[in-house]
Amino acid sequence: MSEKHPGPLVVEGKLTDAERMKLESNYLRGTIAEDLNDGLTGGFKGDNFLLIRFHGMYQQDDRDIRAERAEQKLEPRHAMLLRCRLPGGVITTKQWQAIDKFAGENTIYGSIRLTNRQTFQFHGILKKNVKPVHQMLHSVGLDALATANDMNRNVLCTSNPYESQLHAEAYEWAKKISEHLLPRTRAYAEIWLDQEKVATTDEEPILGQTYLPRKFKTTVVIPPQNDIDLHANDMNFVAIAENGKLVGFNLLVGGGLSIEHGNKKTYARTASEFGYLPLEHTLAVAEAVVTTQRDWGNRTDRKNAKTKYTLERVGVETFKAEVERRAGIKFEPIRPYEFTGRGDRIGWVKGIDDNWHLTLFIENGRILDYPGRPLKTGLLEIAKIHKGDFRITANQNLIITGVPESEKAKIEKIAKESGLMNAVTPQRENSMACVSFPTCPLAMAEAERFLPSFIDNIDNLMAKHGVSDEHIVMRVTGCPNGCGRAMLAEVGLVGKAPGRYNLHLGGNRIGTRIPRMYKENITEPEILASLDELIGRWAKEREAGEGFGDFTVRAGIIRPVLDPARDLWD
């Protein structure tokens, strides 16, 4: 302990079992290859259950039928979730056609799920289809490496820019950062792609033999949009432009939303500003942040292992100085930037190159053929004729990019006929949920299946109080891990038990303030009763342009969270 920082740089003590597992895994190989051939179980055993996460998969089961199968003396219906690595959410139409085919033919649920980390997931991959899915991805230039567990996960990049040139530059950096921080082990290629074992020894110069202490998330942000919710992420590069050209980044470190119910040592935290850096130092700084967290992060307690806790333990200035030392730079003062919103601009938007971009609202990001709304088939038909790319947004929507004027009518016709352009309220456009039941093993309450009817009720309240043309950033997450990013919403519901949620208020529209718990463990009717009263007050008492979250703070309904590490639970 020194006087410079509040706690030790390295936490001494017994390492978690996850650290043992990583060390003994032979650079993430484990016995996954052998386990694949075990037909006695539909799942992976022992360490492999966790090791497959480094390869982009989670083992799950259908919780709707878990009890029924137990009664029949059957093991749970194991199936894998696979998450693709897709920096910035950009996917070609050729790649889309391949994933559409796989989802339809080789998954239990037949759907493609767009996520709020700008990628897609397959749910319900049986063990026999696990190797084929990796080979299918590889055949179209994709992979699932490092999209889960203790790695730098899928790198986000603002997807609805006002200037296409700036987006192109920022997207290139998102890709470079993603590639630079990837694990170097050949385990992925050996196990899934049948590449030969090479005699050389594996090395992980950046991540190390035991990888990172915990998950690590990175973004590239183009103000004034904060669509990627930078404060939910460990490392954020905020684009600074001069005359429409990218010149450098402001770096913000240490955001994160995951908490544990009732555990006051856990907290959501907004990211801290470190300073400005010119473009040429980007990769060195990214590596320095990651290696500092690698060496200083807490490996004795996974609930205290994220970058946000390291920053609070050692102090922001100490961490920043170490990043400067490792990167061989001095940060310049933060350059001015501001955010004005987080939502996607649904519908047609003209780019600066005379091409058009069509943003399609996809409720909960779930792409499936619904009765009367064949979303999946519609997108496949568009993918067959569209010459540009698709872009997945951090709001779980899809952008068809680079549509020339001559193709606009054709694409719009397919989109309308497939239900991809059905009109929805501003409120629905600004609401989001994680997957939760039936596939997520951590789910405590419904989220994706709860949201549509819940928003019907909220729409009725908005109409009742004369604010139907307005919106409140509203999010539901099925457990406190926070994948639905409810802890950056104006109204956040965090699942507590079946049918029960903690209601959080006081975030803001631009995603720079953590909401505080207003009521604990309440039901949907209780939530709606509270919001009925509060939306009524907001409609009558708000100032010009004042969002719901800002109103709840100004009116004294909720105390703002100013320093989450210390006052979130007050």
Curated annotation (Swiss-Prot):
EC nos: 1.8.1.2
Pfam families, sorted: NIR_SIR, NIR_SIR_ferr
Keyword NADP: yes
GO terms, biological process: cysteine biosynthetic process; hydrogen sulfide biosynthetic process; sulfate assimilation
One GO location term (cellular component): sulfite reductase complex (NADPH)
Cofactor binding comment, as recorded: Binds 1 siroheme per subunit.
Taxonomy, superkingdom: Bacteria
Molecular-function GO terms, alphabetical: 4 iron, 4 sulfur cluster binding; heme binding; metal ion binding; NADP binding; sulfite reductase (ferredoxin) activity; sulfite reductase (NADPH) activity
Record: residues binding siroheme: C483
Residues annotated to bind [4Fe-4S] cluster: C434, C440, C479, C483
Keywords: 4Fe-4S, Amino-acid biosynthesis, Cysteine biosynthesis, Heme, Iron, Iron-sulfur, Metal-binding, NADP, Oxidoreductase
Cofactor entry: siroheme; [4Fe-4S] cluster
Reaction catalyzed: hydrogen sulfide + 3 NADP(+) + 3 H2O = sulfite + 3 NADPH + 4 H(+)
Family according to the record: Belongs to the nitrite and sulfite reductase 4Fe-4S domain family.
Subunit structure: Alpha(8)-beta(8). The alpha component is a flavoprotein, the beta component is a hemoprotein.
Alphabetical list of HAMAP family matching this protein: CysI
Cited function: Component of the sulfite reductase complex that catalyzes the 6-electron reduction of sulfite to sulfide. This is one of several activities required for the biosynthesis of L-cysteine from sulfate.
Protein name, UniProt field: Sulfite reductase [NADPH] hemoprotein beta-component
